Amino acid sequence: MSEVVIVGAARTPIGAFLGGLAPLAAPKLGAIAIRAALERSGIPLDTIDEVYMGNVVQAGVGQAPARQAALGAGLPQSVPCTTVNKVCGSGLKSVMLASSQILAGEARCIVAGGMESMSNAPYLARGLRSGLSLGEHVIEDANLVDGLVDAYGGGHMGLGGEKAAECCSLTREDQDRFAVRSYEKALAAQRSGAFDDEIVTVDVPGRKGVVTTVAKDETPRETSLDALAKLAPAFKPGGTVTAGNASKLNDGAAALVVASAERARELRAAPLARLIAQGQYAREPELFLLAPSGAIRRVLERAGWTIGSVDLFEVNEAFSGIEGVRRELGIPEERFNVNGGAVALGHPIGASGARLLVTLLYALRARGKRRGIVSLCLGGGEAVALAVEAT
């Protein structure tokens, strides 16, 4: 069976909600990430067999978002494309699907990633098609309906963050401390240039021909325990989840070039990493935030690894309650989200899985480390995980 390798990886900066990347639709951001990943791989465009791109909030994005991104990146019209919606796991699931296709012999070289523009999510007015009756009517936010509200219990994902914190006995201070560390690590990474190699700058056209360049993640900022302690609970009275210790609404994209080892050799493309194992896990929807524990355990078993043998973990910080997963698995703090996570950097939901993988690859290389695992929880009670080994 062929090995699967990653030969190119890039991401856009993560834009703040209604921030610098807001003028660009998700497929535009996806095209930029795809183009950069391909350029870094050195692989000719006509050698790509297929494209998978994650995208969650698709209302108003237009037909076939992945196809839009691929053609926007300059890929030939002969390349088939698939849009993946597995909520926050979409970007990583795209890479997992690419790996499976290659192992099955259905393709030899695939672009996979994710993209999201939460700034451009529309509002939904139900009932207009058939005519509204007398009385008040609700306009719904597509970010909430399609991305951030539990389809089963009807509660915001933040209530799942509350539930996870309760299950893991995490106090408000525990979560605020976790958030402060995330901000500190993200700011340190920015200042040291740790993100520079993985990010492709984005030129955003504006009025009267003015072009604005976005070159770094927009949401990391200075904060403190005292500052976070002043914030009110965001999702329930007396709760522990706040705007300061939760992830943000964001825009961004990430892409990777995935190939069989044989195809990479044929194309003289230098692998960044080998894909070792992948796994998924599902449990009660309201405990989605804790699902990465199960997914990571499955990947460890399939890879024949232990927690102690893994150099770096990138686990999505949808909420600071993800600290419960770190504690449950016994992951050392110094190996966990070493450059900060979504609490500080942001969470463009369809892109985050690919973004975490890109960040993991560059972090392994910068530190001279080999083994890494990336994992994300996702709405509905699931999680995805992937193990890689740097080459």
Where are these regions (language model features)?
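Active-site-proximal alpha-helical scaffold in enzymes
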Residues: 86-116, 165-194, 255-262, 326, ...
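Conserved active-site "lid/cap" helical segment
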Residues: 1-61, 65-73, 77-80, 160-172, ...
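Active-site pocket-lining segment
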Residues: 160-162, 198, 206, 276-344
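N-terminal extracellular/periplasmic Venus flytrap/periplasmic-binding protein-like
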Residues: 10-12, 23-24, 29-32, 174-266, ...
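Condensing-enzyme catalytic core mediating Claisen C-C bond formation in acyl metabolism
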Residues: 1-26, 36, 225-290, 294-302, ...
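Conserved catalytic cysteine-centered active-site region
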Residues: 55-109, 151-159, 222-248, 327-355, ...
